[in-house]
Amino acid sequence: KVHFEFNDRGRGPKLDSSYTLDAKGLPVTIALKGVDYLKASVDETFTRSADAMTWKNAAEDEKRALVGPAFFLTLNPVPEEDALLARALLNAPEQQLDLVPAGRASIRKLASMSVSGKAGTREVDLYAISGLTLMPYLIWLDRDQRFFAGYSSWSCLIREGFEEAIPAIEKR
């Protein structure tokens, strides 16, 4: 279960999500509720059975035959979903997976470093996930492959207690 929210001058998401994963780290069930960045209602569900996948969100109400390992991407993801995808990719053959509703993603490790903050010192790894957008998506994971940080030109999410590490993460 994950709760995610931020306030950007009165805007920003407020989302509660729960994930059930199989042994390979692929979603079996997802439930996501709350509001998106513009405060529109969010109510997403995903279920994978032995032979089919079904999902419903503001844009889709779909059912498809299950044709192999695949990772479902929600319409309004919380940052933890990126870490779940990264872990699933790291455990997948050739570190690649099909995506649902469409696409294929791959992952590669770019760098490793040690970071320090009020919460201590951690060894973290920078990964690039390709196939989600035109440019690879960058994500930092700790050595337990848990979300550590995500950085872009307009925002940074980092594990609490490691805010002092943002400049080092930014330089990578």
Region roles according to the model:
Residues 1, 5, 9-12, 18-22, ...:
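Gly/Pro-enriched, hydrophobic low-complexity segments
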Residues 37-129, 144, 148-151, 156-160, ...:
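Solvent-exposed helix/loop surface patches that form functional interfaces
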Residues 1-57, 119, 131:
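N-terminal mature ectodomain segment of secretory-pathway/periplasmic proteins
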